[in-house]
């Protein structure tokens, strides 16, 4: 969906101020949130694209003024309630309890196999390549244009700044889980994925350096012949 998360090419948001020597985690709660993500995914609360879609529904002001792992928390709360893992009243009760009793320890459960699975997911990620009998519509060297119509009301990887732009296919990667359907829980619907080369001037106009290119991975349904 279109929203404040899609910031590529947008101006007027002020300077970017990177934090020097930024730590991996700013607080211990961020460590917990990181491990909660694969644990809840393995419990069936969401898939990766549903998770991203929930973050994209955060109101713009809240999105820009909250921390990275707060976005994750929002998505996990949203899907945890939808999946019936907990309800909002239970979450409020537990939150209030630990606000009133900050020195109390949280319950623990030992599951070495789950810990190992989560460790592997965090370290190596998951493979989203899928087999398909469908032939690729495009080949290396083809000129393509990214569809310029508005984003559907779901998570998509078709960034705003690339819509309507013409590029050249420089690599084909086979089929991968299609985010737009996967985010709706409507199936993985594997689609061919391509790397498309765009000139910087095609993407950004005359201010861009004429000898610079951008390589962007684009799913087949986002593309039309140029």
From Swiss-Prot:
Biotechnology: Industrial production of acrylamide is now being developed using some of these enzymes.
Subunit structure: Heterodimer of an alpha and a beta chain.
SUPFAM superfamilies noted in UniProt: Electron transport accessory proteins
Pfam entry (one): NHase_beta_C
Keywords: Lyase
EC class name: lyase
Induction line: By cobalt and urea or cyclohexanecarboxamide.
NCBIfam families on file: nitrile_beta
Catalytic activity: an aliphatic primary amide = an aliphatic nitrile + H2O
Organism: Rhodococcus rhodochrous
Residue ranges, annotated region (Disordered): 1-22
Keyword Lyase: yes
Transmembrane segments: none
Listed EC numbers: 4.2.1.84
Protein name (database record): Low-molecular weight cobalt-containing nitrile hydratase subunit beta
GO molecular function (one): transition metal ion binding
Family affiliation: Belongs to the nitrile hydratase subunit beta family.
Keyword Lyase attached: yes
Function according to Swiss-Prot or TrEMBL: NHase catalyzes the hydration of various nitrile compounds to the corresponding amides.
């Amino acid at each position: 969906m279109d929203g404040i998360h899609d910031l590529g090419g947008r101006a007027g948001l002020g300077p970017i101020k990177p934090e020097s020597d930024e730590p991996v985690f700013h607080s211990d709660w961020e460590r917990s949130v990181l491990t909660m993500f694969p644990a809840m995914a393995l419990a069936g609360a969401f898939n990766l694209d549903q998770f991203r879609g929930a973050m994209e529904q955060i109101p713009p002001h809240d999105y820009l003024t909250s921390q990275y792992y707060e976005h994750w928390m929002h998505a996990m709360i949203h899907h945890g309630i939808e999946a019936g893992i907990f309800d909002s009243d239970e979450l409020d009760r537990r939150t209030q309890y630990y606000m009133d009793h900050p020195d109390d320890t949280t319950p623990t459960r030992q599951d070495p196999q789950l810990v190992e699975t989560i460790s592997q997911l965090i370290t190596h990620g998951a493979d989203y390549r899928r087999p398909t009998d469908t032939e690729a519509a495009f080949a290396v060297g083809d000129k393509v244009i990214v569809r310029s119509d508005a984003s559907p009301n779901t998570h998509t990887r078709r960034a705003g700044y690339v819509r309507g732009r013409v590029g050249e296919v420089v690599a084909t990667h086979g089929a991968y889980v299609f985010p737009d359907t996967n985010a709706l829980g409507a199936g993985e619907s594997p689609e061919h994925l391509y790397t498309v080369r765009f000139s910087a001037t095609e993407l950004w106009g005359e201010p861009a350096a004429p000898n610079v290119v951008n390589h962007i991975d684009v799913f087949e349904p986002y593309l039309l012949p140029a």
